[in-house]
Regions:
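Short acidic/glycine-rich loops and adjacent helix/strand connectors
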Residues: 1-206
Length: 206
């Protein structure tokens, strides 16, 4: 449902959901009851009312005419930022996601008895919903895969083969996500000078 909401608000589905999450902070969840008609969680099952959606029909549009009947015509990026109504729609969708995530987390804790939670998948990048799970104190520890979206599938595949299929010992523990390129100060300084930018140097950045 969040992908449909994202597209309805003028953004790219399955890509710009983070923009909707950010936009939701500027609205009020006035339309939450409508979103509750679309999707609910019941005893381990996520139940969608597909009459609100069109993504399963094979086209490019994720939301249906029924979605439009409830909320009105879709908006452009500019309109959703400027008009309060669309901010409220974003806030309502986010509020439902928060509730769903907490309900799922509570159900998992009850079913498994495990005190630690690991979150992955695209929705795992929704820091607002993750924060609600954290605040609920359902789990003792929560770990969120930094590459929670599709790119992280390769990590999961590699670990599955190594640990499960090859039965190899788990030697690597991920303690940070800072795996990018590393540069020295003189390289930074050279790039800044080439770009003719002003700068200040601090020896202590703590």
């Amino acid at each position: 449902f969040y992908a449909a909401l994202t597209q309805y608000l003028g953004y790219k589905a399955n890509s710009d959901e983070y923009r909707v999450m950010g936009l939701s902070a500027y609205g009020e969840p006035k339309y939450k009851e409508i979103f509750e008609k679309m999707v609910r969680f019941d005893e381990g099952n996520i139940i969608n009312d597909n009459s609100f959606f069109a993504y399963h029909l094979g086209g490019d549009i994720c939301y249906s005419e029924k979605f439009i009947e409830y909320f009105g015509p879709p908006c452009s990026k500019e309109e959703c930022v400027d008009e309060k109504k669309y901010k409220d729609i974003a806030a309502s969708g986010q509020e439902l996601l928060n509730d769903l995530m907490v309900k799922i987390a509570r159900w998992l804790r009850m079913k498994t008895g495990i005190q630690n939670l690991s979150i992955a998948g695209g929705v795992g990048l929704n820091s607002v919903a993750n924060g609600k799970i954290y605040e609920s104190k359902i789990f003792k520890d929560i770990w969120i895969q930094p590459a929670a979206y599709d790119a992280g599938c390769s990590i999961g595949c590699a670990f599955y083969i190594w640990n499960q299929l090859l039965n190899k010992k788990r030697e690597f523990i991920m303690t940070h996500a800072y795996w990018g390129s590393e540069y020295k100060n003189d390289e930074y300084e050279s790039a800044i000078k080439i770009s003719k930018l002003s700068y200040e140097y601090y020896s202590n950045i703590e």
